Amino acid sequence: FLLVSFLTYAQQDTHKRLFILLGQSNMSGRAPIENADTAALPLVKLLDADGRFEVARNPLNRFSNIRKGITMQKLGPGYHFAKTLSEQLQDTIYLVVNARGGTALERFMKKDPAGYYKKTLSRIKQALRAYPDMKPEAIIWHQGESNRDDYQNYLNHLNKLVTDLRTDLGIPDLPFIAGEIGKWNPDYSHIVKRIAAIPDSISYASLVSSEELTNIDEFHFDAKSQKILGERYAKKYLEISGIEVT
């Protein structure tokens, strides 16, 4: 049954699948890149700085046009997210990774003078120009630590950001998959509650748990947890898409 379900899906759905990975430092990646995660992923293509796709390898955020220093870019959830999806679907996965560490949600919004929204949208459109048959499948979002003290309007602002991206991409029902931030810091309690409410506050949104994940410092997941988080993002995408594989 599972094999039939997968074959039927593959036969019906032949467009190239693009995933948009956004957020702050845990999406950028701050965990050490271990030996097992240095391998290139032949079935995963990463948009480079010139608008072309290359075989993905860590650090995935190195081509972000809003990132901080290159030496800060390490292992995020995107590597194991894309690795898991490509293995499950036995198909090529395309990524735009455009994160920036230490950045509050409001800086990513369309009208913010920092211009991160415009720069991010330009990279997504570069990707879509590269392949006419490419379709954004989901926005993968991991952010919140920088809003730990400024959380009151978080859900309203995030809803506005997601709505703007969907409008500018012409996909009003584009799935939005958010991840919980780490739960080890009591200072996160208010923003953790806001993030938990995302599925009830934003249409076509879902949430990935950070339960039992561990950290390397005050803000960041360790390498083991980034692997688990990436796999959880992949599982959530498959779940909401109704794709049955293994």
What are these regions (language model features)?
Residues 1-14:
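Bacterial Sec-dependent N-terminal signal peptides
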Residues 11-246:
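Cell-envelope and extracellular/periplasmic
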